[in-house]
């Protein structure tokens, strides 16, 4: 155990909807309630209009779950265009137009939003910084925080690149998503992680995995993640290092798994909540009451 480290109180526990990517929002909310999560993320495709967004907000509040992030926003860089042959269901997930995205975020009462680059296109650092800063400025008018997510198969492939963008933009409402899968399957850099201030890591997304990828990286991240404690990674050590940072944000779970999706919503939520709390307890975290 690593309880000798001074760790921060976890501000909340988020059920990231990617865990039940193919399920309707109502089932994801049922899972979040069953797992004792304090917040839930929403996809833009969940809300074809603001009326639906208001309905999801009311539904969540009635169950005692706050809507946290609207995830993801991808139309923030020059030349956004979906590649030929992209699956329609993936385009529905990532293709939301900017005005519609921000209208939805406001209607939901979302407190944050995720920004990522979905197609693996490379951009100069100047374009990345300028684009991220512009998103932060627009979001700030609605009191929304913006967290940038890196993925090893995207145009923002690692923590180093993402942190450089966040630092270059230098916006108070701009920070990072730290997804354990993306970090450990990419270029993990403990020395760099140690230098990043806790307040710049807005959210932590937790999942475990096999030591080596099962299939391609995309297949591994979309279908073969595991619950914390069911894989081969030292998540306890990683979480303890993260939680030792003063001002670290919310911690949540995002486990995209074929085997998990065979279960019902309540069992998925319960297993996710139990696994995440067990890991946080082992890492020495003080959980929200």
Regions found by a protein language model. Give the residues of each.
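Active-site beta-loop-alpha junctions enriched in small/polar residues
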Residues: 16-20, 43-47, 72-75, 118-120, ...
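A short acidic, helix-capping loop that chelates divalent metal ions and anchors anionic groups
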Residues: 76-84, 119-122, 186, 259-263
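Conserved beta-strand positions in the central sheet of alpha/beta enzyme cores
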Residues: 41, 69-71, 114, 147, ...
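Glycine-rich, proline-tolerant flexible connector loops at the mouths of alpha/beta enzymes
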Residues: 41-61, 119-120
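Alpha-helix-loop-beta-strand connector modules within alpha/beta enzyme cores
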Residues: 57-74, 129-140, 169, 233-238
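N-terminal substrate-binding region of glycoside hydrolase catalytic domains
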Residues: 31-50, 71
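Histidine-acidic metal/acid-base catalytic patches
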Residues: 1-33, 61, 109, 159-174, ...
């Amino acid at each position: 155990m690593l309880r000798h480290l001074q760790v921060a109180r976890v501000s909340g526990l988020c059920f990231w909807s990617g865990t039940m990517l193919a399920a309707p929002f109502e089932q994801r909310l049922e899972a979040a309630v069953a797992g004792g999560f304090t917040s839930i993320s929403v996809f833009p495709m969940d809300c074809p209009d603001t009326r639906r967004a208001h309905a999801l907000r009311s539904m969540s509040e009635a169950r005692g779950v706050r809507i946290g992030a609207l995830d993801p926003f991808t139309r923030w860089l020059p030349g956004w265009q979906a590649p030929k042959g992209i699956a329609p269901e993936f385009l529905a997930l990532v293709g939301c137009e900017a005005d519609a995205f921000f209208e939805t975020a406001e209607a939901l009462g979302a407190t944050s939003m995720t920004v990522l680059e979905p197609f693996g296109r490379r951009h100069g650092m100047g374009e990345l910084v300028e684009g991220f800063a512009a998103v932060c400025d627009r979001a700030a008018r609605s009191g929304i925080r913006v967290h940038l997510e890196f993925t090893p198969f995207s145009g923002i492939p690692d923590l180093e690149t993402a942190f450089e963008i966040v630092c270059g933009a230098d916006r108070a409402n701009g920070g990072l998503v730290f997804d354990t899968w993306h970090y450990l399957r990419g270029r993990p850099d403990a020395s760099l992680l140690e230098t990043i201030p806790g307040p710049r890591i807005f959210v932590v997304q937790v999942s475990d995995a096999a030591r080596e990828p099962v299939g391609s990286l995309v297949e591994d991240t979309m279908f073969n993640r595991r619950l914390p404690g069911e894989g081969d990674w030292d998540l306890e050590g990683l979480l303890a290092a993260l939680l030792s940072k003063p001002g670290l944000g919310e911690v949540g779970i995002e486990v995209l798994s074929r085997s998990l999706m065979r279960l019902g919503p309540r069992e998925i939520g319960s297993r996710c909540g139990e696994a995440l709390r067990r890991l946080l307890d082992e890492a020495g975290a003080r959980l929200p009451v």
